[in-house]
Every structure is written in C-alpha cells, then in structure tokens.
Amino acid sequence: MTKTTMAVPGALLAAIALLSAAPAQAAAHRVTPGNWLYVTVTTGDARSSHISRLLTCDPPHGHAHAARACEELAAADGDITRIPPKRTFCPMIYAPVTADAHGEWNGRHVEYRHAFGNACGLEGETGAVFALSEQASDGPTPGLRS
C-alpha cells in the first residue's frame, strides 16, 4: 500500500506541472489573429497627451476610419512607409506629433515610429492609419505640397 499512496501524489504533481505549462505555451501564440496594429498618436512630447487604438482588419474595426486604414494598409502590404503620400498643402505651424504602431500583418511583425511637424503632415504621409479621432478631421488641404 505504501507504494500505491506514493504513486498517487507523484502522478498529481506531474499533472499539475503539465497543466501549469499549458498557459505559458498559449501565451507564446498570437493574442490577436489576423492583420492588426496597435496605433498611438502622441501630441507634443508629453506621454500624457496620447491616444491609442487597436486597429483590426478582419473585419475592419478600431477607430472611425478603420475600413479606409485597412484598405491603405492592404495596398501597401502592411508597410506604413509604402502608403502613397497625399498631394496636400499643410500649414507651416509647428505642433509636433509622433506616430507609433506595432502589430502583425500577413504573419510579419510590424514596427513603425515617426515624428511629424503637425497632424496635417501625419495624415498626409500615413493616410487613415493614424486618423484616430471619432470626428471627421479637417485633415490636409488638397493641393500641391510645398
């Protein structure tokens, strides 16, 4: 009987070890499947003045312009630097903004960070990806870029 009672605790310890390893393996897999980016826009140089959204593209969701942002990202194969810049005229007002994005597109890791002179320049270069406000933005004025 002593051998049987010793075998039961040993089996329980082995089962506990296996069960505790399962969550660690699950955490190693993707948290959000599909094409997604966690995007942040920081105004000025203060961390307290930032807005962030999780942009998902299957189906488009995350902010007011998610469908357009996903279309632009799809055309650029998830590379924000390949989004064609808009021909715009932006005011020469210095109001710095920084755009950050990280996530996954078609199984590839995406990292992006760039500082712009103002929000108009940000929208002109990155399209709808960082258009996080719920209201329609004034955005860049169509025309020639100076």
UniProtKB/Swiss-Prot annotation:
<dbReference type="InterPro" id="IPR023549">
    <property type="entry name" value="Subtilisin_inhibitor"/>
</dbReference>
<dbReference type="GO" id="GO:0005576">
    <property type="term" value="C:extracellular region"/>
</dbReference>
<protein>
    <recommendedName>
        <fullName>Putative serine protease inhibitor SAV_2156</fullName>
    </recommendedName>
</protein>
<keyword id="KW-0732">Signal</keyword>
<feature type="signal peptide">
    <location>
        <begin position="1"/>
        <end position="26"/>
    </location>
</feature>
<keyword id="KW-0964">Secreted</keyword>
<feature type="disulfide bond">
    <location>
        <begin position="57"/>
        <end position="70"/>
    </location>
</feature>
<keyword id="KW-0646">Protease inhibitor</keyword>
<dbReference type="Pfam" id="PF00720">
    <property type="entry name" value="SSI"/>
</dbReference>
<dbReference type="InterPro" id="IPR036819">
    <property type="entry name" value="Subtilisin_inhibitor-like_sf"/>
</dbReference>
<dbReference type="GO" id="GO:0004867">
    <property type="term" value="F:serine-type endopeptidase inhibitor activity"/>
</dbReference>
<comment type="similarity">
    <text>Belongs to the protease inhibitor I16 (SSI) family.</text>
</comment>
<keyword id="KW-1015">Disulfide bond</keyword>
<feature type="disulfide bond">
    <location>
        <begin position="90"/>
        <end position="120"/>
    </location>
</feature>
<keyword id="KW-0722">Serine protease inhibitor</keyword>
<dbReference type="InterPro" id="IPR020054">
    <property type="entry name" value="Prot_inh_SSI_I16_CS"/>
</dbReference>
